[in-house]
Each structure stands twice: as structure tokens, then as C-alpha cells.
Amino acid sequence: MIIGIPKEIKNNEYRVGLMPKHVNELSKKNEVLVQSSAGTGSSFTDNDYLNAGAKIVNSIEEIYYNSELIVKVKEPLLKEYNLIQPKQKLFTFFHFAASEELTLAMMKTKSTCIAYETIEDDSGKLPLLTPMSEVAG
């Protein structure tokens, strides 16, 4: 599988979809593409990702056009909608309930959208929301 990590383009969003240590694990059985400077806001360099086994690409278009799975932090913005490919999988915080526009746009892409905020563990808890809740207080 080809996994793509684009640089977040939402204002004041400095997080990155995957840290180099996770890329290191994933790159053992997958190809991982990271957009140049995607990790800068989280203090990760392109070299950190290269050393973890990723390939650095220059543009967000390269990420979307070449990846089967996109791993982000925040929902796609309007200028990303046309980059999403049919049958592509997107893994991010979507918050669909807050945006009918986003929901309809993602339906039109015919992609598979997996929202972090809806993933439950066996006990019914939302493990991907817990770290964000702790940070937010």
C-alpha cells in the first residue's frame, strides 16, 4: 500500500498525520510518501522522515495522486477536495456532523473516509479522542 502524509494547510495547524517512528514501522511493508516540510510544525525534519524510510515529495498533488491511503490530522479543506481520488482512503478528524458541505463533498469523491473521532475500542471508548481531550483540558 502507498500511504501519503500531506502537510496540513489549515491555519494554525502544526501537527502532522504520522510521526517518523510510526513511518518507520509502516515503511517495513508499505511505501510512505511525506510532503516536504509536513512535520516542521511538530519539530520533525524531512531527514527524520527519510531516515524512517519515507520518500519525500514536493507537492500535495503528488501525495494525493499517488497514495492509496491519506493520513492527516484535520479535515480536507475546499482546495483539497478535487485532489481526492475515487476509492482512496482518508484517515483524519472529519467532524462530519459539523459540516454538511464537507460530508457531501466527500461523498462525491467516492473515497472511503475514516473519522478518528468515530473509532471505538472493544469497550466502546473513543481512543483517538482521548489524547486530544487531555491536551485540550
What function would you assign to each model-found segment?
Residues N24, N47, E61, Y81-N82, ...:
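Alpha-helical segments flanking ligand/cofactor-binding loops in enzyme cores
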Residues M1-S36:
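N-terminal phosphate-binding or glycine-rich loops at protein starts, especially the Walker A/P-loop
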Residues S27, L50, M107:
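Anion (oxyanion) recognition and catalysis
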Residues G39-T40, K74-P76:
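Short, polar loop motifs at secondary-structure junctions
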Residues G53-N66:
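Short acidic low-complexity segments
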Residues I2, P76-G137:
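Glycine/serine-rich phosphate-binding loop and adjoining beta1-alpha1 elements at the start
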Residues L33-I56:
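N-terminal beta-loop-helix "entrance" segment that forms/cooperates
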Residues I5, Y65, V71-K72, F91-T92:
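Redox-cofactor binding/interface segments in oxidoreductases and associated redox assembly factors
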